[in-house]
């Protein structure tokens, strides 16, 4: 007889009642089955209009360190700065970057939390599951992820970027206000900084471009290099 116990490793700072959890597990589709479900993430960078966004589909076994690699590739970041995830008031990332305890919150290990460990609501429209991903604490890029569990499609390779709008900002541009100033100069041929900004980002950059093929290639490359952990850790071990 099939067990109705919650899946091993189920994580939630606010657990569901046992009766509801049993109902989820004992339905026609097991919501913890990685062969049946994936996570769809609608992601956009806060403070920028029109929105810079990506629709990502992720294996439910993906951990937060791997999610970091996916987000870096999806938005064209170069992983040159610190980052963290904020989930329900808890901070996840690479604890070794806060060994002096200077952060306001303790940083928990990102590799120890997977998508499958998160508590997905019954009604994502009424009560969506959201994660805040922060990158570059100087420029303060804040990405809001809205997550929902959806059925896995046969023959599809995950993770993947399904849709997107606009190019990610250049690194070290100065946050949302700096990016607005940059675009003013980049778009206006009469601006005194126009040529300098065009040279700085190169010919391939266009603020309205979003090449899904290139993004998905970058995602695949990043995950192959990370092998379940942060790439910077693996690279430092090779050194």
What residues fall within each predicted segment?
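Short linear regulatory motifs enriched in tryptophan with gly/pro/ser
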Residues: 2, 9-239
């Amino acid at each position: 007889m099939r067990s109705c116990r919650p899946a091993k490793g189920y994580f939630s700072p606010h657990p569901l009642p046992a009766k509801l959890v049993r109902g989820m597990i004992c339905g026609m589709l097991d919501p913890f089955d990685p062969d049946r479900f994936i996570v769809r993430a609608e992601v956009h960078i806060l403070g920028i209009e029109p929105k810079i966004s990506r629709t990502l589909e992720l294996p439910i076994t993906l951990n937060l360190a791997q999610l970091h690699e996916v987000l870096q590739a999806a938005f064209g970041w170069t992983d040159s700065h610190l980052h963290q995830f904020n989930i329900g008031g808890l901070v996840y990332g690479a604890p070794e970057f806060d060994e002096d305890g200077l952060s306001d919150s303790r940083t928990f290990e990102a590799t120890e939390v997977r998508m499958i460990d998160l508590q997905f609501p019954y009604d994502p429209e009424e009560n969506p599951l959201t994660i805040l991903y922060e990158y570059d604490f100087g420029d303060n890029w804040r990405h809001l992820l809205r997550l929902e569990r959806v059925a896995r499609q046969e023959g599809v390779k995950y993770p993947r970027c399904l849709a997107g709008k606009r190019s990610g900002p250049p690194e070290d541009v100065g946050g949302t206000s700096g990016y607005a100033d940059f675009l003013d100069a980049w778009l206006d041929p009469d601006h005194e900084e126009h040529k300098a900004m065009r040279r700085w980002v190169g010919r391939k950059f266009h603020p309205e471009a979003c090449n899904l093929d290139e993004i998905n290639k970058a995602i695949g490359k990043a995950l192959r290099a990370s092998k379940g952990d942060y790439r910077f850790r693996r690279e430092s071990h090779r050194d």
